[in-house]
Amino acid sequence: MQLKDYEFGFADATKEYVRKPEIFKDAFCDTRNFVEKLISGYDFLLIGRKGVGKSAFSAKIQSLSLESNSKIVAQVLNLSDFEFSTFAKTGIDNNVSGTQKYKSSWDFIMLLTIYKILFNKLEMIESDSVNDILDLLDKAGFSLENEYKSDIVRLTKVKLGAGIMHFDAEFEKKYNTAPSNYLERVSVITEKMILGLKDTYLNERQVIVIIDGLDDILRYKKNRAEIITSTALLKYQ
C-alpha cells in the first residue's frame, strides 16, 4: 500500500465524528461499556487525564442519537466557550460562597437547555405543559431560538432587574403572587419548568445534556471552580 491509500482520522474525537463519521464508528472502542453506563446507569461523571478520550464518549452518544429509530436526544454544552465572566454576575448574594452561590442560575440554564431540546428537536409544540412554560420564559425575555450565551446575558439582566416589570405583573396575574428579587424570579421559573417536565410524556425518548470541557476550564480563573462545582448539585428526576 502507498501512503495515498491510507485514510487518516483526527486526534480529536469530536472533530473526527463530525468530519469522518465512518472512521469514528470503526475506531471507537468501549471495552468497559462506559457509554451504556452513562446513558442508562447512575454514572454521570467521566474523569480522566487530558487526551485520554473523554470527549470520544460525548461524540459516541451524539452519534447514537442520530441513528434511525434512536430514542436518545443529545445536546452538548461545551464549557470551552462558556461565558464565565458574565455568568459570575448571577451569583445569588455576595455573602454566599461555595456551591450554593450559583446553583439557582445553573438550575435555570440546564432546564432551559432541556426545554430547547423539547421544542427544537422533539417539536413538542402541542404539549400544554411545555407551551405554558414557553409563554412564561418569553415574558421573562428568554427565547428558545437563542444560543446559551444570549441566555446568560439575559439572566444577568434579570439579576440587575432590567426588563422584568412585565414578567412580574403577568406572573402575579396568573399565580396571585409576585417575585421580589432575582432568586425568587429564577426559583419560581425553575419550579414551573420542573413541574412541566413531570407532566410531559416523552414516549420512551431519553434527553441527555452533555457538559464537555470541564478539565480545560478548571485550569483558569478562581471563580470558575466555584461556578462549576455548583453543577454537582443538579439533580432532576
Residue spans for each PLM region:
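A short, basic N-terminal segment
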Residues: 1-44, 66-70, 80
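Substrate-engagement module of ASCE P-loop NTPases
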Residues: 193-198, 230-237
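Walker B catalytic acidic pair
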Residues: 212-216
